[in-house]
UniProtKB/Swiss-Prot annotation:
Family annotation (NCBIfam families): eIF-2B_rel, PRK05720.1, salvage_mtnA
Protein keywords: Amino-acid biosynthesis, Isomerase, Methionine biosynthesis
Gene: mtnA
Residues that hold substrate according to the record: R45, G46, A47, R88, Q197, N248, K249
Protein name per the record: Methylthioribose-1-phosphate isomerase
Phylogenetic classification of the source organism: Bacteria, Bacillati, Cyanobacteriota, Cyanophyceae, Nostocales
A GO BP annotation: L-methionine salvage from methylthioadenosine
Native source species: Trichormus variabilis (strain ATCC 29413 / PCC 7937) (Anabaena variabilis)
Amino acid sequence: MIYPVIWQNNCVLLIDQTRLPNEYAVVEIHRSEEMARAIQTMIVRGAPAIGVAAAYGMYLGAREIETSERQEFLQKLEKVAQLLRATRPTAVNLFWAISRMLKTAYETLGTVAQIKENLLQTAQAINAEDLQTCQVIGDNGLAILPKTPTKLTLLTHCNAGALATAGYGTALGVVRSAWREGRLERLFADETRPRLQGAKLTTWECVQEGIPVTLITDNMAAHCMKQGLIDAVVVGADRIAANGDAANKIGTYSLAIVAKAHNVPFFVAAPVSTIDFELTDGSQIPIEERNPVEIYQVGDTTLTPPGVEFYNPAFDVTPAELITAIITENGAFAPCDLTKSSKQAVV
């Protein structure tokens, strides 16, 4: 199993996902500022993994605070939370994990040392819970995949695998469960421009576990569906509104439109912590814009002439009506049933 975030020897170990697939490297994180930078630069990425990393980042920040006075400690911890919140605006798991850590701090009665101890325990609990959640999501997804053919060919976008979570994955968790039960023929992976998470990360995960994988460019999906090569689409999500609108990596929306046009089921797999019940619909989801260098430069090569302007949103929002079902640890639900079926599980 692949574990992108590990607590070991009083520090956090992160798989450096910016170096995959050509180099497997592990980065040690000792301070909250280092964690914020790792999240911002996508050394660690994927909404659930970011949440786990942020939880540990909160503990690292708490560990750095040198005071025994409770109120002063909590004020400084709020500044750590502010630092981490500013890293990635779209992934709601980040904010959820930070809020849970703050709740632990404020509700702990006792010394500052006891608060710090409880914060570490909470971060470790978030880590363990996410791993278990992903395994359940995988099995819940397997249960609602099309029954025919016996062996399915699935298509995914970006990387919603073990690297994007505490382990196992959400969308790739469904793929893993299907592979384990003999129900997967092959996975098609979109390359996912501009950062190529599908090409670099999803294919890498599949190769590690012997899962048959075929890489395609993003603009090949419609052709593959027309040729009858795809039985279902399974993607992850970074934030889901109460009505079922789902924000995921840029290109997911167009993939959902194409799937609808070809009568291919389109599933979103995500933990309940990704659902933001405070947002009525997807128009309220903040969309991160990243450095345009991701578009116009590959390595040291610039692809465009001078004078070109760029627009680089990292995410788009897929309307609920294009989604067949949202797969959570509580089961799989039609988007219209999301609130009544899942809200009680939100911490």
